Amino acid sequence: IFITHSHYDHIGALSEVKRVWPKAIVYGSSYAEYTLKRKSTFEGILHMSNVAAQEYTGENLAEPLDMSRIQVEQILQDGACVKFGTDAIYGLETPGHTNCCMSFYLESEKVLILSESTGMVRGPKCTTTCVLKDFAQAKQSVERCRNFLAEYFVFPHYGIIPKRLADSVFETIVQDMEEKETMVTELYQQGVS
């Protein structure tokens, strides 16, 4: 199990997945490991999971989350790989959305599974960014992934896009980042925090 970052909408089901497949190993960044050991992280995951459950079902979670199953069990350093027989998955640290973001490259298929630092696709010609930590890091993460050897890119909350289309998607994501960075800078200079 490879986690891109520690937000509830990406790992909220991890407790149940680990209950069903207890021998599965959870891989993530060292910062994700640190984050998932914090009480405040658990409280946030529980709260947001209940908010989502309320929104979709009108009820809280049927069962409480077992935080002991929501942990990084194996730290994957930047550039490190995990072998699966003759195949390998490589981890790429891609911060910007959070400090713990990672993207993953499945070598045999030439597929790069992106973290939210690299932006999101909402539909045809509609992209957005969700930079919560650092615009410069997010832009570096986009460029790193954009120039990677991948033939296919899996965008978070969307799906797979081939390389021939991904370049224009990345371009609109960078433009969106720059617009948002300008807006945030202007608001900050006006005293808004």
Model feature map: region roles:
Residues 20, 147-148, 190:
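Alpha-helix C-cap/termination motif
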